[in-house]
């Protein structure tokens, strides 16, 4: 990989700040970090660098929201998510960068349209067990191929009608476990090496600062505004992946 220029470092720094905020306040914003990293680095390699920063953010989110977790939801998602990760690792090894971005973008827009349709109808029904399996599989697949599982799971958790802190706590534990599970796959694909780790080390402080800022924000944001932000950020991230 070539030496990074000033613009690349700026994009990576912004991406690191987005990671911290997405973990403790704004789920769905993480897709913007995917775009920023993929712009600054080769797309496939960027997934490895971003993964390490996501794990750093996960550590803070797990600590901050350790008392507000819906464990029943997490147990339901385990096996479909693992299946999605397995399929995603094969796809990542075979697909081009453009194919990865477009597939994820198309999936997100489809799920977003379905979510908005349900909300427009005023449906108060929570997603059933079968829907949970489907979202779990898609969450595992998208998080493996592009670190873009956040929006998928955000849409699922919105449907479960969780309050802000339970939403963030459940998402924190989910992604901490999943991101750790992905590390051996990234190493096996040759994407996570010492050069990438040296780049990531410079960015870690930005994730930490943004994570604490996000914690402050999450305690002050109203439920309806939180849900609207999740939907808007998901849409923006999906469109960026398709462009």
Label every model-predicted segment.
Residues 46, 88-93, 101, 141-148, ...:
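Hydrophobic alpha-helical transmembrane segments in multi-pass integral membrane proteins
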